[in-house]
């Protein structure tokens, strides 16, 4: 992942938010990367529409939708897409998987905190991720960085462009794993 780009909402006019956001996204987009837009809370719809209208490949992320996937070991289901995305990202970060983790994250304390703060629980329907409101209450801020990374990754390897795929698998650089006891893991690219 490249360093995260953050644009405060107050810099965008409400009337033109979709068009302005699309312009920002396109200006930072590299290697024809697939864009994933959060359609769970209101403001993503106009951004999604502007990108689609211009022929830019974009995927909608709706975290509240039902999930039909299971954990890698096939033992548990997910309560919703949000839980599925966070759990699958967690599985993809596992350095002990064959070949190690293909993910390298930028060194960003806020991102590290966002990715390691939410907890999971097992309920009757499967795995459930802690509600974002509870994480926000505990941290005193939103987990926007972590949400952006997890959502952008949520489409997984199936939607990597050929350019990005060749860079990932033809690079001599591998992620460096930094373990902080049993509590947390961070994956930084050097």
Which sequence ranges carry the predicted segments?
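Mg2+-dependent endonuclease catalytic cores in nucleic-acid-processing enzymes, primarily RNase H-like
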Residues: 1-127, 170-190
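Charge-patterned, long linear interaction tracts outside catalytic cores
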Residues: 105-167
